[in-house]
Amino acid sequence: MAEAHQAVAFQFTVTPDGIDLRLSHEALRQIYLSGLHSWKKKFIRFKNGIITGVYPASPSSWLIVVVGVMTTMYAKIDPSLGIIAKINRTLETANCMSSQTKNVVSGVLFGTGLWVALIVTMRYSLKVLLSYHGWMFTEHGKMSRATKIWMGMVKIFSGRKPMLYSFQTSLPRLPVPAVKDTVNRYLQSVRPLMKEEDFKRMTALAQDFAVGLGPRLQWYLKLKSWWATNYVSDWWEEYIYLRGRGPLMVNSNYYAMDLLYILPTHIQAARAGNAIHAILLYRRKLDREEIKPIRLLGSTIPLCSAQWERMFNTSRIPGEETDTIQHMRDSKHIVVYHRGRYFKVWLYHDGRLLKPREMEQQMQRILDNTSEPQPGEARLAALTAGDRVPWARCRQAYFGRGKNKQSLDAVEKAAFFVTLDETEEGYRSEDPDTSMDSYAKSLLHGRCYDRWFDKSFTFVVFKNGKMGLNAEHSWADAPIVAHLWEYVMSIDSLQLGYAEDGHCKGDINPNIPYPTRLQWDIPGECQEVIETSLNTANLLANDVDFHSFPFVAFGKGIIKKCRTSPDAFVQLALQLAHYKDMGKFCLTYEASMTRLFREGRTETVRSCTTESCDFVRAMVDPAQTVEQRLKLFKLASEKHQHMYRLAMTGSGIDRHLFCLYVVSKYLAVESPFLKEVLSEPWRLSTSQTPQQQVELFDLENNPEYVSSGGGFGPVADDGYGVSYILVGENLINFHISSKFSCPETDSHRFGRHLKEAMTDIITLFGLSSNSKK
C-alpha cells in the first residue's frame, strides 16, 4: 500500500538515540498544491464578487470616472456643483494632508460616489426596463417600433460580457396577482371539467373567498413579497419538496438520457473518464461564473441564474419532519458505486484536475477491484429510495459517529455521485420499444439501491458505455440540469473525443493513488431498516409503467408551417390522445417557468381549456369539417400560448393560490375553497425539456447528435406523466409514465394514441412527414 504511506506527511518514532523524524516530500508537496488550489478559488470568488457587485459597470470604469473628474478639476471646472469644495472643507480638520492632497482625495471621493450613483442608476433603470413584459404578448414575427426601442435600451443598460450572476440584482421581483384575477382564471380553467351543479358550487366558494378571507391572506402575502426576493420559491422548496415524507425515487427525482443514436465508445471506464472530466470542466466554469446567463429574445432578456448555485457539492439530508439541503462551497472528491462497493476518488493530482485518461484509469481500477461488499453495504442506498422518516431515524442512530459517519460524510460532501452500472442499456434499432423503456426505468430507479437519490445528481455509466443522470428535484428544476447535460454530451463527443481503440486520449499516470474503499460498520438492526426501505422502493419501482419512444414522423420544422407554437401543437395532441385513451378530459399540468423574475422557478399552465376541449370534440366528431377543426385548433392554440405567457409573466394561477394556502395555515384559518383547489389531482402532468441551451454545436450540421431528453414518474396514481423534447427540426422524443396498479392507464396504449393524435392534427393542414410545402 505505497499510496497509504504517501498520504502521511511526516512520521516520527522515539528511539534510544532520540526522535527519528521522517518527512514525506511528496505528501508535503500535495498538501502545498491543495492549499494553493483552495486559495486560487477564494481569490476567483473574491474577484467575481467585485465584478458582479458593480455590474453593469466594470471595475475599470471607476478609474475612467475618477480620471474624468480630476481632469475637469485641473481645468478649473467644477463638475460637482460645489460638492468637492464641501468635501475639501471637511478634510481641513485633518492637518496631516497638504492642500494638493486634499484636492486629490476630494476628487477621488466625489468620483467614487458619482461612479456608485451611476451603477445604481443603471441597475435600477435595467430593473424597470425588465419589468415590462408587453413584448411577450406581441404576435410572433411582428415587433413594434416601441418594442425595438425598448430592446435597444435593455442592451445599452445590460453592460458588456455579463457573468452568470451579473443580472441577479437587476431582475424584477415576482408580482403578486390580484385575488379576483386569480380566482377568475381558476374558474375559467375548471369550467370544462365540471358538471353544471359542481361548477356553481365552486363558483360560490370562489366568490366567497375573493371577497372574504382572500383579501386578508393577500395582505400578508404582499407584505412578504416586499420583504423577500421571491414570495413563492422558499415556500415551494420547503412545502412541496423538503417536507414530502414519501420516497424521492419515482415520485420526485427525474432522469436525463444520453445521445439517442451515437455511442462514442463501448468502454465503460473510458466513457466515465471523459464525461466526469467534462462535468468537472463545467463545475470550474460555474465556480468562475463563466457560464453565460441564459437570455431570451435574441440574447436580450436575462433569466434568473440562482438555481445554478447548488448544482455541485450538494446533498439532501433527511429529517423526521422536514429535510434540509446541505451545500458545500467546494469538494475535491466524488464517490463511485460499483457492484455493491463505495469508492472515494480524488479529483485533483499535482494541483490540477485529473485528465480524462487518468480518470478512466481510476474507473478501471474500481472495475478491476475484486473485493466483496461489507455487510449491509451493497443495498445501503436503498435508504435514500424509501420513505424519509425511517431514513432520518436510521441516519441519526447509526451514522452519527465512527467510520459510518466518515463514510456517509464522504458521500454527502462529494461533488456528485457516480454509479458504474453492471447492465447494458440504450436505444437498440432491432427492439426500440423494449430497449428505451428499460433504459428509462433504469435511470429513474435502477435496482433501488444503486443510485444515491439524495445527491443533487447521480451520474450513471452503463457497461456498454451508455450514460445518464438521475437528479434530485428540490435544489433546481430540469432546465438547469439540462444545461449541464448538453454541455457534457457536447464536450465528451465533439471536443475531448476518444482514441481509435475507444480509450480516452492521453496517457495513464501510475503515480495517482488508488481509489479508497469506504468503510462501514452496519449493525443488523440497520440492515433490517435497509431491507424495509428496499421493499418499499421495489414496490414503487415495479409499479412504474414506462414507455419512451422517438417520434420520427415529423418535428417542429413541419409544425412551424402550421403557423403555431410547437409546444401548443404537442399540448393539443396530448389532450386529443388523453381523450382517445380515457374518453374524458382531466386537469392538466404543464410546467412553465418564472425565471424572468429573481429566484423564479416554475408555474403551472392549465393546458385543458374550454377551447382545447372544443377542438378535441371536433376531432372525434365525424360530422365536423376540416375547416371547422382548423378554426377550433387556432383558437385553442392561441389560448394555450396566452396562458403560457401569463404564467411566465407572473400571472399564473397555482403558485399564487398555493402561497395563499400557506398563509392560511400560518394564520390557522380554514378556507374550503383553497382546500378543495389544492386537493385536485393532476391526472395528466406534462413538461417540455429545453434543447440547444448550450451553443457548442449545431444540430443541422450534426443531425446524429440528438438527445433522448429525460422524464419523470407519474404524479397521480391514476394518471400519466409525459415529458417531451423537440430535437432539431425532425424529431420529438416522448417519455410516458403511469402505474401498472391502475387498471385505467397503460403507457404503451397512450403512446399509440399520442402518435395517432399527432398525425391526425398535422393531416388537417395537408402536411405529412414527406411534405415539401
Swiss-Prot record:
Give the consequence of mutating residue 709 to E: In CPT1AD; loss of activity
Homology family: Belongs to the carnitine/choline acetyltransferase family.
State one molecular function term (GO).
protein-macromolecule adaptor activity
Which effect does the record note for changing residue 414 to V?
A: In CPT1AD; decreased activity
| Localization annotation | Mitochondrion outer membrane
Which gene carries the instructions for this protein?
CPT1A
- One GO CC term, this protein: mitochondrion
Q: What is the effect of changing residue 479 to L?
A: In CPT1AD; decreased activity
The PTM 3'-nitrotyrosine maps to: 282, 589
- What is the organism lineage in this UniProt record? Eukaryota, Metazoa, Chordata, Craniata, Vertebrata
| Reported impact of residue 473 to A | Loss of carnitine O-palmitoyltransferase activity. No loss of the scaffolding activity
* Pathway annotation from the record: Lipid metabolism; fatty acid beta-oxidation
Q: Which top EC class is given?
A: transferase
Q: What is its EC number?
A: 2.3.1.21, 2.3.1.-
Q: Could you tell me what this protein is called?
A: Carnitine O-palmitoyltransferase 1, liver isoform
Per the record, residues carrying Phosphoserine are 741, 747
